[in-house]
Amino acid sequence: MSNRVIIFDTTLRDGEQALAASLTVKEKLQIALSLERLGVDVMEVGFPVSSPGDFKSVETIARTVKNSRVCALARALEKDIDAAAQSLSVADQFRIHTFISTSTIHVESKLKRSFDQVLEMAVGAVKYARRFTDDVEFSCEDAGRTPIDNLCRMVEEAIKAGAKTINIPDTVGYTVPSEFGGIIETLFNRVPNIDQAVISVHCHDDLGLSVANSITAVQQGARQIECTVNGIGERAGNCSLEEIAMILSTRKAALGLETGINAKEIHRTSSLVSQLCNMPVQANKAIVGANAFTHSSGIHQDGMLKSQNTYEIMTPESIGLPRNNLNMTSRSGRHVIKHRMEEMGYGEHDYDMDVLYESFLKLADKKGQVFDYDLEALTFMEAQAEEESFYQLKQLVVHSDSTQGNATATVKIELDGEVVTEAATGNGPVDAAYNAIARASKCEINITSYKLSAKGEGQDALGQVDIEASYQQQSFHGVGLATDVVEASVQALIHVMNLTWRADKVADCKQKIQQKARSLGGV
């Protein structure tokens, strides 16, 4: 048996079913091309009979993608199979994936037929699909709750009819790994023609077991895993592609299995899917979450500085993320502070570690995360636990034209005691407000990242704006929080401006100290 596991991605079919709004044809093509770069073997890109839009998406992707096999879904009905075949006909190679329910509750309650009738429909659908392609996949919907005798019979007959891939879905995420693995093992033991098809699994995450069930299945002989990027999909989602890929890669010695996934494309593909689908990735998500390679515990940080292998079983670079983070918080030890100071070019004799660390802990308790520019301020300036404010917003008035997209903003800002008023236009209210602030402050800041997130629920939820900005080759992070998005955005910018003002003061103070040291050295 081959040790190669086929990765069947269904982000654009099963994954899209979780979205509040459908993706456009252009957006689907963007994701499909990213999946092709990622190296998926098969991509299921739609359900053509469901709508003209889905048909067009499948056809467009089938015409464009060359290195992955394009697949479309069809019920065990001739009209569905016709639509799938027609939409895929422009592809060099394609797969038709047909399915029917096999569990007792589905057969009796949903289909209202006998199992023998359902079996006949399944066989007929596979034979009909084989008229269009040799690559036919058949799925036993709700296989996880199907009586094992019926499941074995269905699989055997579908293979006889010409199915080259048999998919065993845990449609409602009901089984546990030992149970699901037992189903796969039984199929291999009892279905006489099982060696004539690839056994596939499609596990849902209702009980959080989709990845575990899929790994157990390949240990029992399955050789295709159906999954989605970021695990998106119906209800609690699907088996996560990036988790499967990195499990099989990281634990290759133990599992003896491999995929054709280009892991360095994982981060980029995950970010694209998250952005286009408007589904943020939770921070603690395995592999691609913001915290996946972030270390905040002082003990962990100390270990990481000595050897990355102490607390990382894979590297961020392996998934295309070129860095890892040691967040400086109140839990960070002296070793981390010393390391960060060394990275910024400071030797042990440039500062007093006892004084710096005490000041650092006070600031960390107050603001949570401490940044490099905070450390410099603590090093060269006293009483920096309380952040000084050179810029203060006194008034903000915004007028927007929703039909044209233009806006005008008037701001009143206090600059070290002097109040300045300026107005400006912009492409939207935030842009207008930022332009007005730039006029008033004469402060040149380049915003490199803008992120808006909700804190709370409903109409009274607070909007948090996080911005990254560059100033004189340094990076600064500003935060704003308000019920009004424009106000939160302005708060974040003012925060950054005060940080840059403080950085200038630090630089001046640093220069004076260095000049004094040089003059003393010359005496």
UniProtKB/Swiss-Prot annotation:
Matches recorded under NCBIfam families: leuA_bact, PRK00915.1-1, PRK00915.1-3
Family in the record: Belongs to the alpha-IPM synthase/homocitrate synthase family. LeuA type 1 subfamily.
MF annotations from Gene Ontology: 2-isopropylmalate synthase activity; acetyl-CoA C-acetyltransferase activity; manganese ion binding
SUPFAM superfamilies on file: 2-isopropylmalate synthase LeuA, allosteric (dimerisation) domain (SSF110921), Aldolase (SSF51569)
Catalytic activity: 3-methyl-2-oxobutanoate + acetyl-CoA + H2O = (2S)-2-isopropylmalate + CoA + H(+)
Keyword Transferase included in the entry's annotation: yes
Alphabetical list of CDD domains matching this protein: DRE_TIM_IPMS (cd07940)
Pfam entry (one): HCS_D2
Keywords recorded for this protein, A-Z: Amino-acid biosynthesis, Branched-chain amino acid biosynthesis, Cytoplasm, Leucine biosynthesis, Manganese, Metal-binding, Transferase
Domain Pyruvate carboxyltransferase, residue spans: 5-267
Regulatory domain: annotated span: 392-523
One of the record's GO cellular component terms: cytosol
Domain of life: Bacteria
Subunit structure: Homodimer.
Function: Catalyzes the condensation of the acetyl group of acetyl-CoA with 3-methyl-2-oxobutanoate (2-ketoisovalerate) to form 3-carboxy-3-hydroxy-4-methylpentanoate (2-isopropylmalate).
Record flagged with keyword tRNA-binding: no
Gene3D superfamilies: 1.10.238.260, 3.30.160.270, Aldolase class I
Subcellular location: Cytoplasm
Major location (coarse): cytoplasm
Pathway recorded for this protein: Amino-acid biosynthesis; L-leucine biosynthesis; L-leucine from 3-methyl-2-oxobutanoate: step 1/4
UniProt-listed Enzyme Commission number(s): 2.3.3.13
One GO biological process term: L-leucine biosynthetic process
Protein name, UniProt field: 2-isopropylmalate synthase
Gene: leuA
